[in-house]
Amino acid sequence: MIQTQSYLNVADNSGARKIMCIRVLGTSNPSYASIGDVIIGVVKDASPNMPVKRSDVVRAVVVRTRKALRRNDGMSIRFDDNAAVIINQDNNPRGTRVFGPIARELRDKNFSKIISLAPEVV
């Protein structure tokens, strides 16, 4: 459950390290974002000499949440951190690598490029 003012780690090599959510897009509940939802965020911490700078406004898709996600088969999945991958207007990742495990629900929401870059799909 990601809401406005929530901080997320960035799980790619676009240059940002932490982003803060300022708007939740593309969900039935506009107050909270879950895995696979698109958010708008502002970069709070960034690596130097990278394409994404501090205070840039970016679009991102949530790939991990600490709040447990209930699947249709009854299984519940939860991660150690809240994380997102920065995307462009075409829903393609801006980075070339993705770090950490990614939830399988992203495949259902047509983020197949992120799934293909992920080292582990849970």
Swiss-Prot record:
Name of this protein: Large ribosomal subunit protein uL14c
Top-rank taxon: Eukaryota
Gene for this chain: rpl14
A Pfam family it matches: Ribosomal_L14
Function according to Swiss-Prot or TrEMBL: Binds to 23S rRNA.
HAMAP family associated with the record: Ribosomal_uL14 (MF_01367)
PROSITE patterns the UniProt entry points to: RIBOSOMAL_L14
Keywords noted in UniProt: Chloroplast, Plastid, Ribonucleoprotein, Ribosomal protein, RNA-binding, rRNA-binding
Biological processes annotated in GO: translation
Membrane spanning residue stretches: none
Subcellular location: Plastid, Chloroplast
Subunit structure: Part of the 50S ribosomal subunit.
Annotated organism of origin: Porphyra purpurea (Red seaweed)
Gene3D superfamilies the record matches: Ribosomal protein L14
Main location: plastid
One Gene Ontology cellular component: cytosolic large ribosomal subunit
Keyword Plastid attributed: yes
One GO MF term: structural constituent of ribosome
Family (UniProt): Belongs to the universal ribosomal protein uL14 family.
